[in-house]
Amino acid sequence: MFNFHTYSVDEVPCLLNVDTADILPSYPEHVKLSIGLHPWKVDESWQKCIAMIRKGASREDVWAIGECGLDKVHRETLPLQMEAFRAQIILAEEVQKPMIIHCVRAFDELLMLRRELETTCGKEGREPQPWIIHGFRGKPEQAKQMMTKGMLLSFGHQYNLETIRFVFTSSRPFYLETDDLHLSIRHIYEQVAHHLDVDVSRLSLLCDPRTSLFCRHA
């Protein structure tokens, strides 16, 4: 059982989202990190934040860049969000680590940036790093659109039942998370296992990013 995106240290293996200002010298062995600039926190000083993230991005226990992305609820900072997100895309490619994506009402822009990255990587003869959209609640059609562009999905407590069934039958990796909720990740695994009519043990194997996304760390 793996908690793919959380803001608090879990008892099970997890990917802990940390602020670079609060990052500790070390963490328990089962805790791995993701670091990035959340779109809600983007302001005129975003470049300083990216510089701090860059310093920590090469740590062995940092497995992903993020969460980062775009959020049109905070439309007033969207131009800055785009700049900060592009900078983190470049960083993720440099350190060869996946990205944890926060996307709210900005999927067209997200797809545009993914196409830009695919074009750049194609010219260089390499594959882009995976992007994982966390807390995905979209419909199956939107999920298919994202997956076609090489993106993966992570689901929290709330999700579209048809979508998670579609992803399950697609044989593509997907992940489960608590995000910032004070819930047990086991509760989410049990809920999803019930909806998919599978054993929790099987679901735990299917949703373990160490065997699909972070293979080099396993």
Name each model feature, range by range.
Residues 1-218:
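Mid-domain alpha/beta scaffold segments of enzyme catalytic cores
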